[in-house]
Amino acid sequence: QQEAARKLRFSVSQTMSIAQKLYEHGYITYMRTDSTNLSDLALNTSKKFICDNFGEEYSKVRNRWGKAKGAQEAHEAIRPTYIDNTSIPGTPQEQKLYDLIWKRTVASQMADARLIKTDIKVGAEGIEEKFNVQASQVLFDGFLKLYIESTDDPQQDAEEIILPEVHIGDRMFENGITADCKFTSAPSRYTDASLIKKLEDLEIGRPSTYAPTITTLTKARGYVIKGDKTG
C-alpha cells in the first residue's frame, strides 16, 4: 500500500480495491496479509525465472525478512499467482498494480546490489573550508536491475550524482562556481504512504484496516483534509 501510494499515486482505498479485483481474478494471492514470507512454490519459480532471464549470479533465495510487531502472518506475502505471468489483461490501473507486485516479488529473490561509496573533499590554497561531495557507484546492479524502492522524498529519488575517478592528491581546476540558496524545510505533511508507515510504527491496525482507518479520518469525520503536496 505504501509503495503503490508513492510510485503509482494510488490512495490506500484505491489500492485495496484494485488488489481485491486482482485477487478475485486469480492474478495475485490474498492481499489482506501482513506476512513478508513466500511459499516454497513461489521461491522455486522465482529462482527459475531469475536464472533463466538474468543469470544465476542474480539469484539469491531468501524467505525470512523478519516478522513485524503484531503480525499474524496467517497468509504468505502478496505475490503473483504465477511468476511467469509478467503482465495481465485488465484496466491500466490493474496492470500497474500487478506490475508493481510482480517486480517487488521477483526483486525480493534477487542478489544484493554492490555499490562503492565515494567521498571527495576538495581544498584550495588560502581557504580553510573544504568542498565536499558524496556519491555511490553501482558495481553490480543485482535486484536494482528490476526494481528500485521509492521514498517519500521525490527530490531524493530523482537526484543522482556520478563522480569521475579521482585519487588522493589530484589537482583540480575551477571550471565554474554556482551558488544555490536553500532553506530548512518544515516537516513534511503526511502522505498516504507515510501515514501507513506511522500506523505500523505505532502498531495501530493491520493491512486490512489501513484503508478504512484513513477513509474515516479524511472522509467520514473530516479530521484530516487531503490536498496537493505543495500545501
Where are these regions (language model features)?
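Core catalytic DNA strand-manipulation module of type IA topoisomerases
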Residues: 1-231
